[in-house]
Amino acid sequence: MKVDWIKKTKEGIQVKDGSFFVDPIYPVKKAIITHGHADHARAGHEHVIATLETLEIMKERYGNNFCKKSTVLKYHEKLTIEEVKIFLAPAGHVLGSAQVVMNFANQVITVSGDYKRQDDPTCAAFEPIKSDIFITEATFALPVFKHPNANTQINLLIKSIQNFPERCHVIGVYSLGKAQRLIKMLRNNGWHNTIYLHGSLVKICNLYEKFGIDLGDLEPATIQDKPEKPHDFYKGKLILAPPSALADRWSRRFPDPILGMASGSVSYTHLTLPTICSV
């Protein structure tokens, strides 16, 4: 099959001689963005087309002026640019994540963006699209990546918290997607205690709740306003933080913390932190 209307350029995936790009890494006139992670969603484009959730995530991360113009495109809403018919389909990756489905010259090409086929209670599930060409991300495509059952891992975390009431658990999570999925799965598995958040996680969690994802009782993981010594207050508590904070002095303020990572990848032997939750 000859395809001459889409190609890879230094900016990213270029469609119809630059009429628009998908997830470009350099500023362009018109960009369709699959989701809000920084390696796909960059500031500086003139016109950004994405789901409302992705646009709000970009606004939260980059400020109101992250682009000159933005257009909300709902899932399965039709859009035509230079004779290319376009719609977005759920990708199951994070809130608002989408596949870009393009139809031109009797050819259907789907750009997956990052996607996930496992259940995730915080975003719309991945939707298979019949395509002539499927341009896929392959972050975890190698056979070495074997993910255990997510609910099993969540219950192991809950059991660990219950087994060590004199210690706190500090789990490293990425601020967009991983944090909210972990929290929601904990709630769905019966853990309704307050979860304490590093400051860098708060805004995106609030944004998820704005879009109807109930994350339960969340509080900042501060030490200044606690009624008792932080060492005593945080015993038996669960704290979520970005991975970088686990090796920082920030995590040492807590009582003999058990450190872990909520990761989509495997635990390699050279890692110093255990992967408690592979979700």
Model-derived features: positions:
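Short, solvent-exposed amphipathic alpha-helical segments in soluble enzyme
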Residues: 37, 126-128, 185-190, 212-213, ...
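Residue-level preference for the first positions of well-ordered beta-strands
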Residues: 133, 167-170, 194, 236-238, ...
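A contiguous, basic/glycine-rich beta-loop/short-helix subdomain that forms a polymer-engagement track
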Residues: 207-263
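Structural motif
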Residues: 25, 173-176, 198-199, 240-245, ...
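Hard-cation-handling environments
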Residues: 157-167, 173-180, 184-222, 229
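Conserved adenylation A10 loop of the ANL superfamily
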Residues: 34, 269
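Single conserved hydrophobic/aromatic residue that forms the stacking wall/gate
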Residues: 270-279
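His/Asp/Glu-rich metal-coordinating catalytic cores
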Residues: 2-16, 21-26, 30, 38-168, ...
